[in-house]
Amino acid sequence: VNGYIANGTVSKRHGTGSPVIVPYQTFDTADHPICLAPGNDRLWALCAKVLGRDEWATDPQFAKSAQRVAHKTELLPMIAEALKAKPRAEWLELMEKAGVPCAAVNDIGELARTEQMEASKLIQQLPGGPKVVGLPISFDHVRPHSPRSAPTLGEHTDEVLGSLPK
């Protein structure tokens, strides 16, 4: 987040995935990535239906969790291809309506603009200075706020020099 609010730099995403649950990872859609997490066979059947591939839920290679893990090299590219057909917002709506756990995968810019980030007051505007990432802790539901910006070059020179013995 620091890089984004300081100069607009958005870090690269890295692939994700569970070695014991398939699918349980991020995928690209027509526009932005999504994380799918149908963590059991019932949720997988719902996910397959939303993807328009009901037959995956009964296919002997994919019907049960252990089989999906064993055949993930075949299954994951098919899921990836299906998800490219629609934008993220549409998939999120369809998956959520069906009860399939899923979430948007935000880049740093999207994250910095979320309601949750604003509500957490994690990004703080310093008086007369830049926006910074605040402390990631709170006390009694209050996040400590930085009282001021760093001093400008030479701001305290006279004060410091005046305090030195002559």
Per-region residue spans from a language model:
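Short solvent-exposed loop/turn micro-motifs enriched in small/polar/acidic residues
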Residues: 17-20
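Substrate-binding/catalytic subdomain of NAD(P)-dependent oxidoreductase enzymes
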Residues: 1-15
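Conserved PLP cofactor-binding pocket of PLP-dependent enzymes
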Residues: 96-117
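Flexible, small-/acidic-enriched active-site or ligand-binding loops
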Residues: 63, 126-166
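Aromatic-enriched alpha-helical interface/lid elements that frame and gate functional surfaces
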Residues: 22-98, 102
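Short low-complexity, flexible loop/linker segments enriched in glycine and/or proline
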Residues: 117-123
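Short, glycine-/Ser/Thr-/acidic-enriched flexible segments
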Residues: 41-42, 110, 144
